[in-house]
Amino acid sequence: DGFKAGVKDYRLTYYTPEYQTKDTDILAAFRVTPQPGVPPEEAGWAVAAESSTGTWTTVWTDGLTSLDRYKGRCCDIEPVPGEDNQYFAYVAYPLDLFEEGSVTNMFTSIVGNVFGFKALRALRLEDLRIPTAYIQTFQGPPHGIQVERDKLNKYGRPLLGCTIKPKLGLSAKNYGRAVYECLRGGLDFTKDDENVNSRAFMRWRDRFVFCAEAIYKAQAETGEIKGHYLNATSGTCEEMIKRAVFARELGVPIVMHDYLTGGFTANTTLAHYCRDNGLLLHIHRAMHAVIDRQKNHGMHFRVLAKALRMSGGDHIHAGTVVGKLEGEREITLGFVDLLRDDFIEKDRSRGIYFTQDWVSMPGVLPVASGGIHVWHMPALTEIFGDDAVLQFGGGTLGHPWGNAPGAVANRVALEACVQARNEGRDLAREGNEVIREACKWSPELAAACEVWKEIKFEFATVDTL
């Protein structure tokens, strides 16, 4: 019937409720808030079109390709329970639309343009189902949970970390000293803060050298393998790799990257280097709240977490759950499972919109960090189980007697909780009792319990402005 110019009606092409999704499709769940007066179907098919092959008008070059093969399809729309004028739109994208092994391209396609679309008041990507065919084009985490435990020779308990504070202003020598004290006291890891890169008061190379010295000294004295997350994030990919190379030359076990500010391309580059050279990779999620904090716009963190597992990282910060609201606990555990497990069943109550099969891609250790201290240890052990890194910054360095006793207190609290759990005690109910008993034979822990006995961080969650 020939080519007819004119503005397109997306509905005819992109709203296909009868479509049977394929195993190779990437499936997306969007939370759509249409502008007043825009029907939900229209918003749904507009999302499908705008994030795949659509353009606003008919173009004659459409005749040179098969839209049916390449278009995204809005295959289901349902109202969000309890919300006015919000809808879940499910969109299926054919795999051909995505470059192999590129998280960058996946996001450019799915969320690149559509979020500014005028017919929508707000748009949030709640979840993605990544098909196994696409997952197998990614290397994923450099090592994963099991290999990390084997490298560190640490089993049957969560790992302990600590972010060195004050994060800016220390000289490299004093920074290294703080690292040594924490590791000597009983922590497994210490950490560069996310914004510790390279400054006039502490250049990266000096920091790397003094931290390596601290690691080796602490290892020699404790007989345990220790690590410090050396932050390799920098202004260019070349400089980042240069820093990772130097870390490898020092023989340290782990480096670190800020994957959102650094970008997925840089992150995947570093992850490949880390696997090739036997370095573990710790990932910080600085900037995530810019993307994931609003309930009705942006992207949920579970999507960023899935993307990180594909791009590559052995640890990633994932919130603490402690002292937060109960509902949030289930949602957090949902994406913690998406990071660690091989196969995760669809479960809307935990925020998991699609069943996800990772086909044996290595898992990522979730890192609980931010405002936690010894009294939280039973809850953290109970909630996260063994496969997690528990990170106490102020909860170590804020100890009245100093860093090493702070580290001792945390290690004693952790070992007490793990032992109590293994003996069949219920940490949810008896947690405080377990900590109190341990205080009797650890003056360091007793002092820590005294300092933090009353501190709580409880606010209602802020997710809409």
Swiss-Prot record:
<dbReference type="GO" id="GO:0009507">
    <property type="term" value="C:chloroplast"/>
</dbReference>
<dbReference type="InterPro" id="IPR036376">
    <property type="entry name" value="RuBisCO_lsu_C_sf"/>
</dbReference>
<dbReference type="Pfam" id="PF00016">
    <property type="entry name" value="RuBisCO_large"/>
</dbReference>
<keyword id="KW-0934">Plastid</keyword>
<feature type="binding site">
    <location>
        <position position="285"/>
    </location>
    <ligand>
        <name>substrate</name>
    </ligand>
</feature>
<protein>
    <recommendedName>
        <fullName>Ribulose bisphosphate carboxylase large chain</fullName>
        <ecNumber>4.1.1.39</ecNumber>
    </recommendedName>
</protein>
<dbReference type="Pfam" id="PF02788">
    <property type="entry name" value="RuBisCO_large_N"/>
</dbReference>
<feature type="modified residue" description="N6-carboxylysine">
    <location>
        <position position="191"/>
    </location>
</feature>
<comment type="similarity">
    <text>Belongs to the RuBisCO large chain family. Type I subfamily.</text>
</comment>
<feature type="active site" description="Proton acceptor">
    <location>
        <position position="284"/>
    </location>
</feature>
<keyword id="KW-0503">Monooxygenase</keyword>
<feature type="site" description="Transition state stabilizer">
    <location>
        <position position="324"/>
    </location>
</feature>
<dbReference type="InterPro" id="IPR033966">
    <property type="entry name" value="RuBisCO"/>
</dbReference>
<dbReference type="InterPro" id="IPR036422">
    <property type="entry name" value="RuBisCO_lsu_N_sf"/>
</dbReference>
<keyword id="KW-1015">Disulfide bond</keyword>
<keyword id="KW-0479">Metal-binding</keyword>
<dbReference type="InterPro" id="IPR020878">
    <property type="entry name" value="RuBisCo_large_chain_AS"/>
</dbReference>
<feature type="binding site">
    <location>
        <position position="317"/>
    </location>
    <ligand>
        <name>substrate</name>
    </ligand>
</feature>
<dbReference type="GO" id="GO:0000287">
    <property type="term" value="F:magnesium ion binding"/>
</dbReference>
<keyword id="KW-0602">Photosynthesis</keyword>
<dbReference type="GO" id="GO:0004497">
    <property type="term" value="F:monooxygenase activity"/>
</dbReference>
<keyword id="KW-0120">Carbon dioxide fixation</keyword>
<feature type="binding site">
    <location>
        <position position="193"/>
    </location>
    <ligand>
        <name>Mg(2+)</name>
    </ligand>
</feature>
<feature type="binding site">
    <location>
        <position position="167"/>
    </location>
    <ligand>
        <name>substrate</name>
    </ligand>
</feature>
<keyword id="KW-0150">Chloroplast</keyword>
<dbReference type="GO" id="GO:0016984">
    <property type="term" value="F:ribulose-bisphosphate carboxylase activity"/>
</dbReference>
<keyword id="KW-0456">Lyase</keyword>
<keyword id="KW-0560">Oxidoreductase</keyword>
<keyword id="KW-0601">Photorespiration</keyword>
<dbReference type="GO" id="GO:0019253">
    <property type="term" value="P:reductive pentose-phosphate cycle"/>
</dbReference>
<feature type="active site" description="Proton acceptor">
    <location>
        <position position="165"/>
    </location>
</feature>
<dbReference type="InterPro" id="IPR000685">
    <property type="entry name" value="RuBisCO_lsu_C"/>
</dbReference>
<feature type="binding site" description="in homodimeric partner">
    <location>
        <position position="113"/>
    </location>
    <ligand>
        <name>substrate</name>
    </ligand>
</feature>
<keyword id="KW-0460">Magnesium</keyword>
<dbReference type="GO" id="GO:0009853">
    <property type="term" value="P:photorespiration"/>
</dbReference>
<comment type="subunit">
    <text>Heterohexadecamer of 8 large chains and 8 small chains; disulfide-linked. The disulfide link is formed within the large subunit homodimers.</text>
</comment>
<dbReference type="InterPro" id="IPR020888">
    <property type="entry name" value="RuBisCO_lsuI"/>
</dbReference>
<keyword id="KW-0488">Methylation</keyword>
<feature type="binding site" description="via carbamate group">
    <location>
        <position position="191"/>
    </location>
    <ligand>
        <name>Mg(2+)</name>
    </ligand>
</feature>
<feature type="binding site">
    <location>
        <position position="369"/>
    </location>
    <ligand>
        <name>substrate</name>
    </ligand>
</feature>
<feature type="binding site">
    <location>
        <position position="194"/>
    </location>
    <ligand>
        <name>Mg(2+)</name>
    </ligand>
</feature>
<dbReference type="InterPro" id="IPR017443">
    <property type="entry name" value="RuBisCO_lsu_fd_N"/>
</dbReference>
